Amino acid sequence: MFAVVETGGKQYKVKEQDVIRIEKLNASVGEEVTLSNVIALTDVNNNIVFTQSATVTASVLEQCRNDKIIIFKKKRRKNYRRKNGHRQYMTVLRVIKINNME
């Protein structure tokens, strides 16, 4: 059984005991969070069901930062060069349970 969850503007296909890296959530390590924006999930026969009442329960494993990406701007022949870096804050979750409320 899997579910498709949307958080941080991205969609993730998750099963129980999966570990996912998502955009930063305001939760401390060890805390349980509930992801309520479930787009689709599968039932016992692996049929895709679209439901409004399903939730996914996960626990926070780690609060970390992603790898650095480099932003480099340049204008040719003008001696204009700008280099900048960015590291996005991430939350690592372990999916505990997929709750189907039907």
From Swiss-Prot:
One of its GO terms (molecular function) is rRNA binding. PROSITE patterns: RIBOSOMAL_L21 (PS01169). One of its GO terms (biological process) is translation. SUPFAM superfamilies: L21p-like. InterPro entries: bL21-like, bL21-like_sf, Ribosomal_bL21, Ribosomal_bL21_CS. The keyword RNA-binding applies. Disulfide bonds: none annotated. Keywords: Ribonucleoprotein, Ribosomal protein, RNA-binding, rRNA-binding. GO terms for cellular component: cytoplasm; ribonucleoprotein complex; ribosome. This protein binds to 23S rRNA in the presence of protein L20. Belongs to the bacterial ribosomal protein bL21 family. Part of the 50S ribosomal subunit. Contacts protein L20. NCBIfam families: L21. This is Large ribosomal subunit protein bL21. It comes from Ehrlichia canis (strain Jake).
